[in-house]
Each structure stands twice: as structure tokens, then as C-alpha cells.
């Protein structure tokens, strides 16, 4: 049975007019041929509304009951979409994550998908109906609702596509595809017809917002084609997929995009006992709280001091602040949080093989008078820390320095089967 999975985010479902517009997309695909399974997010603003209600009654940040409450948003969207499709003459059934067989780990608020049964989804598709599945949620081993955290609905869609062996997973949003920079801050940014999954994962991690890193990583592991398209246009979007290409890497443009992230905090930790390494204790604290670390710098040990620094999400600083202060104090040291920084990254392939790229990055920012600190390099990403208020200036400078507003790289046309992702 040929299957297509489509995912619609909160912005695409924010009003009834947008719900109907998304339903027309689904109807078009359903009438054209393959069976269609749809994954939906909560309607725009609904999750924030539910979080405010929980905060008003003093609910803990991550708990069983909060997950029960937040799951209402996606359930509302799924039922509303199924009702809309039914009114258009398209038979549809809404399924919660539990009903769709989505199994998760036990971490409330940030669970991982551990498996999908999908028997009821298959039964609906076999009966000619559209299966509308709630994203962002499943059930843990105890049978309790668990939400998936950042990127949860995208991850649900990719996991379902993998389980159903779908031809592709289409993710619909409000932009035309993956861009060479965020088009909201740089109108000259170019829509990319095709992006390698590894590069897309780096772009997502480094600040590209439309697709989450975990969704792309899962798609790459499971061989799922992903296409992100604009729900309001017929633009072809961006294909995120591996592709065979006979030309050597040296003939292609190595730099694909410039990304930025202002949800960044730089954390500086020091201790006065140079005989002890506090790094293992610091990273234990971060890991126990699910806090992702990016750039890391260490200096010392010196005669009387050991220092280290790293970046985390600014929005997660409160989660780890007290525990880090406690660890540092146990070493006779302290912690400083710098919240006034941004991260700008040049993303592509084979970047370490071209040492001139790091030189070009630093020279361009220096010429623009943008202070820099902490540079990190890999084959797919060059990242640098800049003052928060100069982040957009740095994006514009590097986009120009690497000539990313020019024509698409050779051979960047979408694969025949097509898939798209967007920044």
C-alpha cells in the first residue's frame, strides 16, 4: 500500500480558514492516489495558553498531569481536522498518540519515541480513510501520556512515515523551503532546492527553526524522505535527502547556508583547586537535566585555577543555574552566565578541508567591526560567538562573504521523488 505522510504545524492550523486550507491539501493528495496519514500540532497559540493555565495553578514544569493537559491541544487539532475533512466528503478518523500506538520513554515533557504500533493507522488507511494523528505525544510504559518536547510533532511524522514505509514525509509550514539564511531577517536569502541530511541536521542544531535536529536525525537513520513546503503556495520546497552525485566535492559549493541563534547563554565556570578537574561533575549536572551543550572551551589547569566554558540554550539557563553554582562552590569556585551573546554558523560540507573558509569568516566579521569569541570548527559547521545585538549583522556579513545570494549550487535540483525541508 503506497502511503504519504503529511504534517501540519500550529501556524498552518491557527484559524478555521487555515484548517480548511490544509484540508484542501490533504483532499488533493487523497484523491490523487496514495493513502494519506496526517500528523497535526496544536493550533497556533494553544500550547502557550495551556501552559499559562498550568502556571496559574502552580503546576510543576514537567509532570504527568502537565502532559495530560498539553496533549489536549493536539487532540483538538486532530478532531477538528477530521471533522473538516468529513464535511468535504473525505472520510477521516482522528487518533491520539496512544490510539496510533506511539510508545515513548518515561521522561515527561521531553520523551523520546521508542516505537510505533500503527495498527489502527493501517486499518484506517486500508479502509480508504485519512488517518489524522496527534503529534507531540505518545504513551509511556505505564500507559500515561508523555509529550515529546521540542520538535515533537515533526519527529512523530517522520517516525510514522518510517513505520508505514511511506514514500515521503511532507512537512507543511509558512515558508517556501530551507533557505540560505533566515528570510525573516535577510530577505536576500535563497531557497535551497536540496540539502543533504547531515547538513540539514547541523543547520537545525545551529539555529534553523523549521525542522528540529531530532527529526532530521531520525529521517537519516530510517531513510525517510522529507519535504517541507509552504501550505499557502505551490512552491516545490526543499528536498532533504541523500543523493548520488558523480562529481567530486571540490566542484560544488561547499558552504550552503548561514544560520543564527540568539537562544544562547555562555557559561563560564572556574575553580581554585587546580589539582581537580570539575568538568566531569559539570557535565553530569547538564546531562541529568537534559541540557544540550554546544561550544566548549577549557583553559588550565594553572597554578591556582582551572577554567572552562560552554554554551547552552538561554531558555534552559534557569534549569541548571543552581546546580552549577553548587558544583562550582564545592570546588572553591563560581559560575558566570553571559546572556548577551548570539551564535552565527556557516554550514556546509568539507569545511575543514578548506582552511581558507575559517579565515574568510573571521576576516569578514573583523572588517564589519563585529567582535568575535569562541570559534568552533568541523567538517559541516563553523560557529562563532558574537554580541547578541550584532547577530543579524553577522548573518548579513557572512551571507555576503560566502556569496550565498547567488544562483543555486550546481546540481541542487530536487530528487525526482522530491522532499522538502525549511529554515
Residue spans for each PLM region:
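Short hydrophobic alpha-helical runs that function as membrane-insertion/retention elements
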Residues: 37, 168-172, 226-228, 294, ...
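Nucleotide/pyrophosphate-binding catalytic subdomain
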Residues: 1-216, 311, 385-390, 402, ...
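Conserved beta-strand termini and adjacent loop/short-helix elements that scaffold enzyme active sites
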Residues: 95-97, 229-231, 296
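Short phosphate-binding/catalytic loops that engage adenosine nucleotides
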Residues: 34, 90, 224, 291, ...
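A structural alpha-helix within SAM-dependent methyltransferase catalytic domains
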Residues: 23, 27-30, 162, 220, ...
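Phosphate/diphosphate-binding glycine-rich loops and adjacent basic-rich segments that engage nucleotide
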Residues: 134, 187, 192-193, 202-263
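Glycine-rich beta-alpha junction loops
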Residues: 43-44, 175-177, 222-226, 230-235, ...
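A conserved regulatory-domain signal marking ACT and ACT-like small-molecule sensing domains
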Residues: 237-423
